[in-house]
Swiss-Prot record:
HAMAP family: UPF0246. This is UPF0246 protein LSL_1719. It comes from Ligilactobacillus salivarius (strain UCC118). One of its GO terms (cellular component) is cytosol. Belongs to the UPF0246 family.
């Protein structure tokens, strides 16, 4: 069983606490993106990043000095968004950390696909960003089916805990025989069950921790998840989507 998650915009460096396992599988393609980013001026990058001046300045300076071989942080420790705070990889048990290194993958606009303990450097490039590299105008075009091919190299079950922006890079290439399970986290609002972005990020992080720390390997075991009021609801679920409702 493999688990996929989204990255986070907010990143940190921690080159001392944990060892990296290897470099990203698509580091060469990340180098192409880095060269492209370095060819842009400040205003062009700010437009690509769609952010304020403070964030643009931080990331512009990062791009100028970026080296994909030095001062690397394990990927799962490098992001610090809501999902990662809920996941708490810094305090994983040793067994959960080993399982993460083997089965947890992060889909990235810049690196393509990352193993949890792959060594990376802070960057900013969302999957929905527009690019102009050869005849490619989106990162979905740039990555093509390479992320999908790497993820399904072993034909394993994939549990999707990524947002649509990132899972889209895989879902468009899925074949009928591919095992791809979506986990959705919803709560009632005005008589309807809806997924709220912030609450879903928190729940996805909780689910990752639940799977890793309980060494879960089967879909039926995932259904036992009950954290922060969420319960599996079979009446809303299908063969390809597990729906959890917060009461």
């Amino acid at each position: 069983m493999k688990i996929i998650i989204s990255p986070a915009k907010k990143m940190v460096e921690d080159t001392d606490s944990f060892d990296i396992s290897k470099l990203p599988i698509f580091k060469d393609k990340a180098e192409v993106l880095l060269t492209w980013l370095k060819s842009k001026n400040y205003d062009e990058l700010k437009n690509i990043w769609k952010c304020n001046d403070k964030i643009a300045k931080l990331n512009y300076d990062r791009v100028q000095d970026m080296n994909l071989d030095e001062n690397l942080t394990p990927a799962v420790m490098a992001y610090s968004g809501i999902q990662y705070q809920a996941m708490g990889p810094q305090v994983f048990t040793q067994e959960a950390l080993q399982r993460a290194a083997k089965d947890l993958y992060i889909i990235s606009g810049f690196y393509g696909i990352l193993g949890a303990m792959d060594g990376i450097t802070p960057y900013r490039l969302e999957m929905q960003a527009k690019v102009d590299i050869n005849d490619q105008h989106t990162l979905y075009q740039f990555w093509g089916d390479s992320i999908y091919q790497e993820l399904y190299r072993d034909n394993e079950l994939v549990v999707n805990l990524a947002s649509k922006e990132y899972s889209k890079a895989i879902e468009r290439y899925l074949k009928p025989q591919d095992k791809f399970i979506i986990c959705s986290f919803k709560k009632e609002k005005n008589g309807k069950y809806v997924q709220q972005a912030t609450a879903a990020k928190q729940a996805r992080g909780d689910m990752v921790r639940y799977i890793l720390e309980n060494n879960i390997k089967e879909i039926d075991e995932i259904k036992n998840f009950s954290v922060n009021g969420y319960q599996y609801e079979p009446q809303f679920s299908t063969d390809t989507e597990l729906v959890f409702i917060k009461n």
